[in-house]
Amino acid sequence: MRHIRLLPLFIFIALCLLPTNSNASATLPKLDLTVLDSCIAVKRQTNARYEQRLANMKQQLSYAKKDHAKRSRLLYELYQSYSSYQFDSALVYIKKCQEEAEESHDAHQMEKIQLNKALLLAYGGFYNNAEEIIKSVDYNRLPDDLRYDYAIAAYWTYVFWSAFTMDNEFSKSMDSLRTRYLDIAIQYSQKGSANWYYLMGEKSYFMEEDPAKTVTWYLEVLRRERTYGRLMSQAAFAAARSYKMMHNDLKYGQYLILSAKSDLLGPVKE
């Protein structure tokens, strides 16, 4: 399973900011890492508040045993809350969502849950299982609101799978599928939203456009996304990547720190 842990991220930041030679040490800008110290100091309290929020939702769920609509909503909220926090718990709740949808014979919700499960499995590193679900869904029969869910699940599946296989013939086919589903996701994403800007940044990056252009998309995400979590972390990391390509060490370090800060202060564990 592919887990993203905080400690490797901190190590990665430290290594990336180290000068590679004596000349570099004279020019490499100094970065204030104390912001991460303060974030680490409050991480336990942040997690405690988030755990309390989860506990409150579970309590509400226990009072809604016969209210299928409310149960469906709460189960889905719990799945979403766990999706970047604890993979195993997210998997438990996506299965409960599936059972609830089947019990209420809600075909639309069943397909939505299936696609969300594929996305979750992709994030967890189960690429083949995610692809099996995606291929089991008839895209041509989906309404527009589920076509986005389909495309984004497929996109991330092939992004992660391609990165896992590294540079070989299999990776090339994954890259082709990644591009195809990215275009579809952009088509059905809400234009002008933080998520749409992020996807446009991804397209610019994979098309190998000028990083000065690519980074503008990610900066638009950060102007719109004010909640610490996965999207902010990903956008900040992608912005840092662009600045590294532009040889802007100061901005590179600043956005890596922002990415780590978002991981620490948001519900991001895996």
How would you name each of these model-derived features?
Residues P8-L17:
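Bacterial N-terminal signal peptides
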Residues M1-L9:
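Bacterial N-terminal signal peptides that target proteins for export
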